[in-house]
Amino acid sequence: AELLGLLQEQTERMSRMTKVLLEMSELRSVPCEDDIELGPLSEEVLTDLAPLAEHKDIALNCSGCALIIGSDTLLYRLVFNLVENAIRYSRPGSTVNVSICDNNSHVLLRVEDQGPGIPKQYRESIFQPFFRLDKSRSRAYGGAGLGLALVWEITALHGGTVEVETSSENGTTMLVSLPNRSVALTEQ
């Protein structure tokens, strides 16, 4: 029975991985030309992830709003992956914060968790497909090692950047910088 459970778990993991790989291969065919209100989109992500957060006794907060041009489907996936990771790695009883601000040329999206942090030497590698900090984290937190690679690709498609802004044993802040609507319109 234990072996059967393990096989089922691995089959489900492979299925999820295949789905994400297919998503990644089709990214460039998705049009990125809609006006997107990032605040309401982020609130929708938090609503969809609320059951996972409640299960881990994690509060979710979102503040700010900004208008960008892009694909709502892809930007939803970007925010979803960042917030899901933040929930996955945060300590029970903590808070995941999503903040959005427009600094006149770029929209800054920050996702802040209260997890174990990311060592300095891995802060760029985490965006590579299948990268894992270590196998024990992989087993403890799940995932296929593709979520942040997908975030990287989606951000690049929208003309932006993503990075680990800060990280310590008290948590991590991921920063996504995307051209705001006025900059995106002048670049078209």
Residue ranges and their predicted role:
Residues 93-105:
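Short beta-strand/loop element within the Bergerat-fold HATPase_c
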